[in-house]
Amino acid sequence: MNLKKVKRAIISVSDKSNLKKILPTLKKFKIQIISSGGSFKKIKSMKYNCTHVSKYTKFPEILGGRVKTLHPKIHGGILNIRKNKTHQNDLKKQNIQSIDLVIVDLYPFEKQIKIKSKKLIEYIDIGGPSLIRAAAKNFNDVTVISDINDYFQLTKELNINKGSTSIKFRKYMSAKAFGVTAYYDSVVSDWLNNQLSIKFPIRKMIHGKLIGRLRYGENPHQQGGLYKTSENLGIDKIHGKELSYNNYNDIYSALSILNTFKKNEGAVIIKHT
């Protein structure tokens, strides 16, 4: 199972609503917590021990909070390979402690696009993706949690393994984390391209979030899943059983035909081939 003991965690989250679900478990296994900004204040307000990142790094937050966790003592603590003697000697020389767990979610950039925030540029996260990617790269030694919906899985993993995580769990969370940052970057890229009215960018990312599994794919023996982009699907299912891949193709055909009508009146009947 290649278990790794979690001794130290860094927490930096935008959505703090689920912290209460994970903090008791971290306390149970005596896991030291490092945090910053609003996350630090929230953790302290809930009466849990927590070290401010500035106290740990001995370097203050600067640029109005734009630079908080971008520091060698943080990233060195995450990226070091535990079995590499050179890495461990570097840590000793610089008084850096290993960080075994990274709990980070990103600024809600996509949400701010929808409400047309005037401060949208400030929601482009830099420190968060850096922490996530560093931890995800070093999955052999570090656990990364990039989705607040995974707190239950983390607590379950720590309880089963008595304060440790398995390589299977770390690798799964690593794959998920790279998906999170890739999706996030693609949303930012699309927004900038739209600002410049660039219709055919050199690189175009098609990004989506899984809504759910379909009844089946194109054929009954095949599997299918439905993903949505940053835009709303714009449809509601009123009645009937779960939809299949072919059903969604039918819906697309119907909507395409409806869009050709000049008036907002009409009906389309579709029978798929």
Feature-to-residue mapping (PLM):
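A short, charged helix-loop
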Residues: 101-122, 126-165, 223, 228-235
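N-terminal glycine-/serine-/threonine-rich phosphate-binding loop
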Residues: 1-33, 38-56
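Active-site loops and adjacent core secondary-structure elements that bind or stabilize anionic groups
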Residues: 152-157, 162-273
